[in-house]
């Protein structure tokens, strides 16, 4: 079990969510499963500067009625499946890497100072790869062909 710092001190920003309907569709096939129990998930989030931010969600665990899986959890909005960080954290890291052109270790230091998040080097690299996958290469090459043709105009 991972160590989790105490959540709920006065300097923390906590957003509570409840995602636990009686029935929820399977993520693979869409067949509805029945809720068996409820767990609490704590996901690190980026909200305000110099404050730790969390999403604390009560999430339903469902028994599948299909052959895709035995059990599954309800999806939390803006959090990847089995994710420890929200998509906003991933987006903030990707912006620091690409738009601000910061090196990996500077991004780690910045996230620690600004948002009190201790991120690993592997997670920073995964955010960079995720941002690279978001690029639509067909539209990129169309842009390059129209704006940077091989003919030089004088």
Regions found by a protein language model. Name each.
Residues 1-80:
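Short, flexible loop/hinge motifs at secondary-structure junctions
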Residues 154:
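Extended mixed-charge, aromatic/glycine-enriched low-complexity segments
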Residues 48-151:
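Short, positively charged, Gly/Tyr-enriched micro-motifs
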């Amino acid at each position: 079990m991972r160590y989790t710092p105490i959540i709920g001190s006065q300097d923390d920003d906590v957003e509570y969510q409840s995602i636990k309907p009686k029935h929820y569709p399977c993520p693979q096939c869409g067949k509805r499963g029945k809720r068996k129990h409820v767990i609490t998930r704590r996901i690190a989030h980026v909200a305000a500067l110099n404050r730790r931010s969390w999403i604390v969600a009560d999430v339903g665990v469902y028994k599948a009625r299909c052959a895709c899986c035995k059990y599954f959890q309800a999806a939390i909005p803006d959090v990847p499946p089995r994710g420890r960080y929200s998509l906003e954290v991933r987006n903030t890291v990707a912006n620091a890497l690409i738009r601000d052109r910061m090196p990996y270790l500077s991004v780690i230091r910045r996230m620690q100072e600004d948002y009190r998040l201790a991120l690993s080097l592997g997670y920073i690299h995964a955010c960079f790869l995720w941002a690279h996958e978001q690029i639509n290469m067909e539209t990129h090459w169309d842009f390059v062909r129209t704006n940077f043709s091989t003919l030089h105009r004088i």
